[in-house]
Amino acid sequence: MFSRLLIPNVKHKIDTVLDQVGSRMIAGLLCLALSVMLTGCSLSRSGYLSQVAERPSKAMVVDVPFFAQKELQCGPAALAMVLNWSGVDLQPSDLSAEVYTPGLKGSLQSSLIGSARRHGRVAYTITGIESLMAEISAGHPVIVLVNLGFSWFPQWHYAVVLGYDQGKEEVILHSGLIANQILSSWTFKNIWRRGEDWGLLVLPPDRLPEVAEEDEWLTAVAGLEHVEQWPASAIGYATALERWEESFVAWMGLGNSLYNLHDLDSAAEAFYQATLLQPENGMPFNNWAHVLAEQGKRQEALTAAQRAVDLGGPFHDTFVQTLEEIKRITTD
């Protein structure tokens, strides 16, 4: 039996991320009524942006299309903007059924993440102004969740951050009906903080975030496997290996993705590389054995399968089943 993604903790991490972001929602078009008030806030009340060093003093992502949101539809609008930027040609109306929940009158964060994955994009969450400015300066727009109301009367809203200017202490966003809206950093800090400084990157799988961490990137790419976006997940794992060439999880994920793309030669090589990285782990030997058997390399498959059984571990029963299946093939 082929052990699909026998990688400890990755599936758990995906579920945890979705649980964490699944409990909030936005509440529609109040942003339009508040926009005049927001842009009028004092620029001198914060050094929010200037506190971040080692970044350009100003940056702007110029190629993000703008879609004016319809009532209660800021989730589909924001997601459509960044998906189009990433190369996926969709309108907000194409996404509404995927991300908008009528009963909640808004879009959950987990729905945006799931939709991005279904369209072959890596959904990578960030938090904090340092990460936000790093991504903008790298040319990556960021969806942000802000609360335009109060803690006791929240008015959730999604916008897309496009730029910043440290000297002027300003943040530039596509929001509501306003393209390139300018907010003071003090205003942005307060409304974003109420949304727990949550940001979302929607990236092509060959493009790492500026602030990419290995575990977080691999968890995000595993989300593509979860929705069977095999070409995208294969690219995402290969991209990880360009930076973290000794990542066991990336080699295993690459092997799984390539196997599902019916590229047995490349899948076998990926699992072989994983065996070199963790020679005392039965999982890569089990998967390698399965692919070798499909390639008709039965003796090599038996050797690899037996090695997995000998190593044992929590998937020992699966390893035994793989070995028995290969033995039956060799006697047919």
Regions from the PLM with identified roles:
Residues V122, I126-H174:
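Active-site-adjacent substructure of cysteine-protease-like catalytic cores
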Residues S42-I126, S131, P204-R207, G223, ...:
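Cysteine-nucleophile protease catalytic domains, especially the papain-like/related folds used
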Residues R243, L277, L311-G312:
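Structural marker of alpha-solenoid helical repeat scaffolds
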Residues L224, W251-L258, A270, P284-L292, ...:
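TPR/Sel1-like alpha-solenoid repeat signature
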Residues S42-G47, Q166-L254:
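Noncatalytic regulatory segments and standalone regulatory/sensor domains
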Residues E214, F248-V249, G282-M283, H316-D317:
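Helix-start (N-cap) detector for alpha-helical repeat units in TPR-like alpha-solenoids
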